[in-house]
Amino acid sequence: MQTRLRVYITGEPGVGKTTIFLKVIDKLKSQGYSISGFYCPEVREKGQRIGFKIKSLDNEVEDWLASIYAKSSIKIGKYYITINEDIINKIKEKISKSEIIGIDEIGPMELSVPKLKEIIDYVLNEKPIVVAVVHRKISFKDGKTFVVTYENRNRLDNEIFNYIISSIQ
């Protein structure tokens, strides 16, 4: 598989970007593609967001990415970056072995962690096929960007999946 394909998913907060991303990843896995990467779900406590986890797409690796409770030298908004370097190394190892890479999200928080930014740069520069959720204020010149809205979110996963399949076959 020598195709170079970049698919970006963006939209306003809470519109369903992660849901669509995970549906697309699941559909690709069901077709037998080797996929790895990570996603960063929010963590809520009593209805309030208290931070973010980082999880490998196979859910074998998980840890805190950022929290309002932890203290560290890197702070984005109200969140302190707390990621463990061992977690980053495990995710990087998984990524090196896969043909399709999924990332949710490429945003200010993820890019503020030097080792995580290294992985993102490596993936974008070296891996043939990337599907990534991108913060609404970040854009890339290469690839195709899909904007999630309340109007299209119930069908966009199929549109993205079909675009990827038609582009790599």
Swiss-Prot record:
Gene3D superfamilies: P-loop containing nucleotide triphosphate hydrolases. ATP binds at residues 11-18, 100-107. Keywords: ATP-binding, Hydrolase, Nucleotide-binding. One of its GO terms (molecular function) is ATP binding. The keyword Endoplasmic reticulum does not apply. Pfam families: NTPase_1. It comes from the Archaea. Its EC number is 3.6.1.15. The keyword Ion transport does not apply. It catalyses: a ribonucleoside 5'-triphosphate + H2O = a ribonucleoside 5'-diphosphate + phosphate + H(+). Belongs to the THEP1 NTPase family. Has nucleotide phosphatase activity towards ATP, GTP, CTP, TTP and UTP. May hydrolyze nucleoside diphosphates with lower efficiency. NCBIfam families: PRK13695.1 (NF010248). This is Nucleoside-triphosphatase THEP1.
